């Protein structure tokens, strides 16, 4: 029955969309998203994927139209503030912070601008898509300004004479530099999150959500971990174990045909640097392998 299928909203295009699709596939959700269809159905789970504009996702969650949504915190925060002003529903639950979509929301000015702190922004005209987040910051700083609402290409506003400064998302800063701007004030930091509608789901849907969250945990944990395998002389076993970074107690196995060497296997949440590998080698370790982990369940 359609009402028993979990409805998940994702951004229809862009980097966040690509990362979300990769995550869903890594979680074992089989769905064909290669076509331009706005709704896609999973082949192996009771899940429907709705591809929509990113700024529509919070509203779909808050209005109870969909069950889950993958969204940037910046978009969620802006929509939440806008709906609060309009006295529209804002209830939702953030159920998982995700390991992608990290960016910052910053004010940028012309590279020649003599910036002496936030007070230098007084009485400037600032172009932005996120008027409410900007407004909150400027009011907290007690700085008068004029807002210029733009829905795209915010970075060209100063050159076009539309604004004195901008407030926009920044990942690397390359776009700002290309447009003769410099970042002067970070006012908000964002990452991707998974949000859920506030009203309770039926048991079948909630069970599916719980399964999905467990798989997301497994995928994200696996990305942060490495599987380390090596052969070690028993005479230096404790010294070698002490060099393995951030690990639980390793699995130690006797090597076939050898009484003075063992195999060590361990999952590490820290990188094994070349210097450490060289130290291990000095202690007699051999066949040292550091492997990525695709999936993990603790």
From Swiss-Prot:
Requisite cofactors: Mg(2+)
Keywords, ordered alphabetically: Amino-acid biosynthesis, ATP-binding, Cytoplasm, Glycosyltransferase, Histidine biosynthesis, Magnesium, Metal-binding, Nucleotide-binding, Transferase
Major location (coarse): cytoplasm
E.C. designation(s): 2.4.2.17
Highest taxon above the source species: Bacteria
Catalytic activity entry: 1-(5-phospho-beta-D-ribosyl)-ATP + diphosphate = 5-phospho-alpha-D-ribose 1-diphosphate + ATP
Pathway(s) it belongs to: Amino-acid biosynthesis; L-histidine biosynthesis; L-histidine from 5-phospho-alpha-D-ribose 1-diphosphate: step 1/9
Annotated InterPro entries: ATP-PRT_HisG_long, ATP_PRibTrfase_cat, ATP_PRibTrfase_CS, ATP_PRibTrfase_HisG, HisG_C, N-reg_PII-like_a/b, N-reg_PII/ATP_PRibTrfase_C
Any one of the GO BP annotations: L-histidine biosynthetic process
Function: Catalyzes the condensation of ATP and 5-phosphoribose 1-diphosphate to form N'-(5'-phosphoribosyl)-ATP (PR-ATP). Has a crucial role in the pathway because the rate of histidine biosynthesis seems to be controlled primarily by regulation of HisG enzymatic activity.
Name of this protein: ATP phosphoribosyltransferase
Organism (species): Psychromonas ingrahamii (strain DSM 17664 / CCUG 51855 / 37)
């Amino acid at each position: 029955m359609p009402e028993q299928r979990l409805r998940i909203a994702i951004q229809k295009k862009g980097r966040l969309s690509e990362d979300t699709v990769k995550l869903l596939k890594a979680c074992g959700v089989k769905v064909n998203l290669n076509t331009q269809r706005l709704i896609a159905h999973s082949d192996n789970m009771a899940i429907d994927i709705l591809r929509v504009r990113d700024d529509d996702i919070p509203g779909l969650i808050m209005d109870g139209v969909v069950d889950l949504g993958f969204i940037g915190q910046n978009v969620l925060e802006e929509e939440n503030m806008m709906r609060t002003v309009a006295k529209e529903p804002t209830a939702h639950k953030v159920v998982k912070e995700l390991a992608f979509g990290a960016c910052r929301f910053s004010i940028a000015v012309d590279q020649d601008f003599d910036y002496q702190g936030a007070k230098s922004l007084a009485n400037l005209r600032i172009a932005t898509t996120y008027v409410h987040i900007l407004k909150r910051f400027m009011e907290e700083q007690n700085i008068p300004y004029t807002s210029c609402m733009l829905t795209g290409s915010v970075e060209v506003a100063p050159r076009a004479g539309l604004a004195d400064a901008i407030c926009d998302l920044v990942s690397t800063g390359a776009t700002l530099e290309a447009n003769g701007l410099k970042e002067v004030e970070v006012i908000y930091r964002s990452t991707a999150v998974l949000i859920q509608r506030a009203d309770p789901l039926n048991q079948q849907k909630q069970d599916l959500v719980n399964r999905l969250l467990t798989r997301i945990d497994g995928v994200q944990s696996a990305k942060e971990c490495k599987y380390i395998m090596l052969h070690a002389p028993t005479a230096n076993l404790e010294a070698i174990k002490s060099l393995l970074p951030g690990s639980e107690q390793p699995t130690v196995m006797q090597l076939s045909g050898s009484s003075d060497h063992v195999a060590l296997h361990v999952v590490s949440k820290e990188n094994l640097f070349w210097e450490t590998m060289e130290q291990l080698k000095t202690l007699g370790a051999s066949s040292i392998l550091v492997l990525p982990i695709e999936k993990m369940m603790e």
